Amino acid sequence: MQAALHELHAALGGELLGDPSLVIRRIGPLASADAETISFVSNARYRAQLAQTAAACVIVAPALAEDAAQRGAAIVTPDPYHYFARLTQWWAARLRVAPPSGVHPSAVVAADVRLGEGVSVGPLTVIEAGAVLGDGVVIASQCHIGAGVQIGAQTRLAPHVTLMPGTRLGQRCLLHGGVVIGADGFGFAPHQGRWEKIEQLGGVVVGDDVEIGANTCIDRGALDDTVIGEGVKLDNLIQIGHNVQIGAHSAMAGCAGVAGSARIGRGCTVGGGAIVLGHLELADGVHISAASVVMRSIKQPGQYSGVFPIDDNASWEKNAATLRQLHTLRDRLRTLEKKSSP
């Protein structure tokens, strides 16, 4: 794969400084860039690295345009990181081999399934009765599409994705390998020392432009649907419980978990390994630090953390022991304050 700078500029815009005929064969970081690499600088504190890099071209903000031009070609744009993201999409699209349209002979597709224009169904995939696939949908090998599932146009499923009945995907979604959407939520009623299963009768609704990482699971609702808003980004190995609602353009890092019936607002982020307990509500613009456990609803936007800092084991044990005695220490402090007050 290679492209001249003028091709990048024509596709993505920005102000091009330097030789437009330079050939780019790689996108890479400043430190490992060579004379055929395009890189980017998103912050002025990396000015020194900009001067030292061997990159053929660097994407920079206007504040670094002069520095970049002194060392070689540059593309100047208000938001270099966003430009870099768009560049990776453009580059990947040129690298990607379009799958053949049509249904592979080894796939099993029910007679009443509706396939849009240009749909591709890979080997050993099963699509059950009543499913609807929009134009340009790509289903890779060994996927399972349950009865009545709806998949919006231009959505892509990697191998081994499972969509259970009652699942509706929006347009332009990307589901990575091993994703399971619409399995039963965890619902059981205790009765005389045993557990009685509560059948999960809802579905899962996923909005447009959602990306779901490998081996992430989203459970179907108990009665109402589980809802994933448009533009949501979910990393690998995330568990979303039944009846959860995640607002548009929120993002969650790997190994996070959201228990049943929790509601997460728009534009929220949840760090890796963080847990949101069931039936809680996070307002729009709430950001949860990695490994935190959210045990109460959060009504105001902002950054929230609930992580016990790491330490050597001996110190940690002492601090943990102190924490267990906080209520006693509080009572002793109150007693001392009363004695010392006039």
From Swiss-Prot:
Catalytic activity, reaction form: a UDP-3-O-[(3R)-3-hydroxyacyl]-alpha-D-glucosamine + a (3R)-hydroxyacyl-[ACP] = a UDP-2-N,3-O-bis[(3R)-3-hydroxyacyl]-alpha-D-glucosamine + holo-[ACP] + H(+)
GO terms under cellular component: membrane
GO molecular function, one term: N-acyltransferase activity
Top enzyme category: transferase
Keywords, comma-separated and alphabetical: Acyltransferase, Lipid A biosynthesis, Lipid biosynthesis, Lipid metabolism, Repeat, Transferase
Domain of life: Bacteria
SUPFAM superfamilies for this protein: Trimeric LpxA-like enzymes
Any single Pfam family the record assigns to this protein: Hexapep
InterPro entries: Hexapep, Hexapep_transf_CS, LpxD, Trimer_LpxA-like_sf, UDP_GlcNAc_AcTrfase_non-rep
E.C. no: 2.3.1.191
GO terms of biological process kind: lipid A biosynthetic process
Active-site residues per Swiss-Prot or TrEMBL entry: H242
NCBIfam families noted in UniProt: lipid_A_lpxD, PRK00892.1
Family of the protein in this entry: Belongs to the transferase hexapeptide repeat family. LpxD subfamily.
Protein name: UDP-3-O-acylglucosamine N-acyltransferase
Organism (species): Leptothrix cholodnii (strain ATCC 51168 / LMG 8142 / SP-6) (Leptothrix discophora (strain SP-6))
